[in-house]
Design a protein with these regions (language model features):
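Ligand/substrate-recognition segments at binding pockets and active sites
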Residues: 68, 250, 397-468, 511, ...
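Extracellular/periplasmic solute-recognition and catalytic clefts
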Residues: 246-257, 274-332, 355-356, 362
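Structural transition elements
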Residues: 335, 362-399, 416-423
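N-terminal lobe/hinge region of extracytoplasmic solute-binding protein
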Residues: 67-121, 236-239
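Gly/Pro-rich hinge or "lid" segments in bacterial periplasmic/extracellular proteins
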Residues: 103-107, 172-174, 178-179, 183-185, ...
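N-terminal secretory signal peptides
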Residues: 1-27
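Long beta-strand-rich cores associated with HINT superfamily self-processing modules
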Residues: 543-578
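Extracytoplasmic/peripheral linker and loop segments enriched in polar/acidic and small residues
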Residues: 186-189, 354, 385, 438-455, ...
């Protein structure tokens, strides 16, 4: 088979991405020469070594033991550590290594795969597995393990609620929905031990992003078959990540140990990580008592630690992929009128609304938060729903609600949850009343009831948050708002031009061109009032001065573990306390 040639534009794109990862022109030429196909341009940049970079006079602590948790980080006992079967098991991500992982800028880079390539259109992807990839028992972790694990996730017998994550793979959906008898037609095939070939339903330029998602980590087949649902207990677990599970004392503590068989073990400095399972209501007290080296912060604790001279330098904000927004139901008055939907967008005083969040939210003007792939910062788009009370009232001219009168009864419906959701919703109610004279009744529903009504398009106006699953605009736009979805659709709103931009973004191989389609989609959705962005979620943490190695993104912010980035423990190290 003849390999396609690399164009100048593709070479420039590759050079740009490698430069962002710290690779110079000479290094770029070496990497480019080794690419198996131009389809992988941009995905083969390797992360830098995690080896400690000590300051002059600084010494590594003799005991490399990190105490981590509290403030909402692993506040409840995990149901398992089996992300392959249950994405939201609440387990420890550092036990696992996927084919790809995400760097501090949420870009996919090779991990267990040493190289990734594709055909010209991006419909067939090939992952070359590194030959030093091993399980924690020392046995090889191969392409066959990934084939078995991914098909296990799709298997209807697994009853995996998140199996649709793999529906881009050819044959995955019919297999998962029991429309075919077995997995033989699923487009995941190990070509020997070290090559995994994945055939998709069509061009999917973002597929390496999916391969880096936590749901794509492998499971150890012998352990699963021997121990069943108990295979991730500490005594049974065989994993392939930088750490192993030494102890799991349920509802009390998790203890991790460095995995000596991990292919990157030489760059992992920590020997031990202790994660006590601490309820959120315990606050920051364990950190203040020097029982923790690193912790998440809640509202009251944030103010106190940030204001105290002894701790203010330990507090930092970190990027979090979450957005609060409103979805007006276009089938229900008064939101069946686009002028009303646009008026609501102009009536939201976002600066005022986020004040109730005490630093845990910032005003949003689009779906994707800054610092994440696909984020849009375009004045034209920012102006579509800018706060402008006069423009809001002007939008109502010619409608039955001109002058802010004759509003029907309006319910603002939300899910019952923490995370500062209700105060923000109440702040939205206040600004709608102030600037549109629209009185709303807040309806708070149990999550299961809320979800059923959401998918049934039963609510007039919905207050909802979206936490990004994987860092690609396909997730924020296609998975959330695509009008042709047959299930799991959150709103009745449909816009054909919007859908066409999403389809083009999905099917386009070139990264820059894809982002243009998604920016157009954002503009179309806001112009039509398909949704109203209100606030981006922010999170805060504190870290002791002797903890080093946290990675920073291009915005200069520390990045910590979540469901996207999970590289904190391999990078962190401790120095002698002053």
């Amino acid at each position: 088979m003849k390999r396609p040639t690399i164009t100048d534009a593709q070479m420039d794109l590759l050079a740009e991405r490698l430069s962002a990862a710290g690779v110079g022109r000479r290094g770029f030429l070496k990497v480019a020469a080794g690419l198996a196909a131009l389809g992988a341009a941009g995905f083969n940049a390797r992360t830098v070594s995690a080896a400690p970079k000590l300051a002059p006079g600084e010494k590594l602590a003799r005991e490399q033991h990190l105490r981590y948790g509290g403030g909402g980080w692993i506040a409840n006992d995990p149901s398992s550590h089996d992300f392959n079967k249950d994405l939201y098991c609440g387990g420890v991500a550092a036990l696992w290594a996927g084919l790809m992982k995400f760097n501090a800028d949420f870009q996919p880079v090779p991990y267990v795969a040493e190289k990734v390539s594709s055909n010209a259109e991006g419909s067939v992807w090939t992952f070359t597995i590194r030959k030093d990839s091993k399980w924690s028992d020392g046995s090889p972790c191969t392409a066959k393990d990934f084939e078995w694990s991914w098909k296990r996730q799709m298997d209807p017998a697994s009853k995996n609620p998140y199996s649709a994550f793999f529906y881009d793979i050819k044959g995955a959906e019919p297999f998962n929905k029991s429309k075919v008898p077995d997995a033989s037609r699923v487009g995941v095939v190990a070509k020997g031990d070290w090559t995994l070939e994945v055939t998709l339903e069509g061009p999917r330029g973002y597929f390496p992003v999916l391969a880096g998602y936590l749901a794509a980590v492998p499971a150890h087949r012998p352990s699963v078959e021997k121990h069943g649902d108990k295979w991730t207990e500490a005594a049974n677990l065989v994993c392939n990540g930088p750490f192993t599970l030494e102890t799991w004392e349920h509802n009390k503590v998790l203890v991790l140990r460095k995995n000596k068989h991990f292919f990157g073990a030489k760059d992992v400095t920590l020997d031990k990580v202790t994660i006590p399972i601490i309820p959120v209501q315990s606050g920051v007290l364990p950190y203040e008592n020097n029982e923790l080296d690193m912790t998440a912060l809640q509202t009251g604790d944030l103010r106190r630690l940030r204001d105290a001279p002894a701790t203010k330098g330990q507090v930092f904000r970190y990027p979090f992929p979450g957005t609060w927004y409103l979805t007006p139901q276009v089938t229900k008055p008064p939101f069946d009128n686009v002028k009303v939907r646009r008026a609501v967008g102009h009536a939201i005083d976002r600066d005022n609304v986020v004040r109730v969040a005490d630093g845990f939210a910032v005003p949003a003007h689009s779906m994707i938060p800054p610092g994440f792939p696909g984020a849009v910062d375009d004045k034209k788009i920012r102006d579509i729903q800018r706060f402008d009370p006069k423009a809001a009232m002007a939008m109502l001219k010619g409608t039955p609600y001109e002058g802010g009168r004759n509003w029907p009864k309006v319910a603002l419906t939300m899910r019952d949850e923490g995370l500062g959701s209700k105060p923000l919703a109440e702040a939205v109610q206040a600004v709608l009343l102030e600037h549109l004279n629209m009185r709303t009744e807040l309806e708070v529903l149990e999550p299961r009831v809320f979800r059923a009504g959401l998918w049934g398009h039963n609510y007039q106006l919905v207050w909802i948050r979206w936490f990004m699953d994987y860092p690609d605009p396909h997730n924020e736009y296609f998975d959330t708002f695509y009008g042709k979805k047959t299930e799991g659709k959150r709103q009745a709103w449909v816009n054909d031009a919007f859908d066409k931009e999403l389809e083009a973004g999905r099917d386009t191989r070139d990264t820059k061109k894809r982002l243009v389609h998604y920016a157009r989609a954002e503009e179309l959705m806001q112009m039509d009032g398909g949704y109203i962005p209100v606030a981006w979620v922010t999170r805060w943490a504190a870290v002791k001065p002797h903890v080093r190695g946290l990675e920073k993104n291009k915005q200069g912010e520390f990045v910590v573990d979540g469901n996207i980035y999970f590289d904190t423990f391999p990078n962190v190290y401790l120095v002698d306390k002053a």
